Curated annotation (Swiss-Prot):
It is a single-pass membrane protein. Component of the cytochrome b6-f complex, which mediates electron transfer between photosystem II (PSII) and photosystem I (PSI), cyclic electron flow around PSI, and state transitions. One of its GO terms (cellular component) is cytochrome b6f complex. The 4 large subunits of the cytochrome b6-f complex are cytochrome b6, subunit IV (17 kDa polypeptide, PetD), cytochrome f and the Rieske protein, while the 4 small subunits are PetG, PetL, PetM and PetN. The complex functions as a dimer. One of its GO terms (molecular function) is electron transporter, transferring electrons within cytochrome b6/f complex of photosystem II activity. This is Cytochrome b6-f complex subunit 8.
Length: 29
């Protein structure tokens, strides 16, 4: 696995996680 693709995967994962966290916060969990 390339280090660049690994970094992109981590970035997308953290972005999706934070996005879902914001959505949950707006819905009152």
């Amino acid at each position: 696995m390339d280090i660049l693709s690994l970094g992109w995967a981590a970035l997308m994962a953290s972005f999706t996680f934070s996005l879902s966290l914001v959505v949950w916060g707006r819905n009152g969990f």
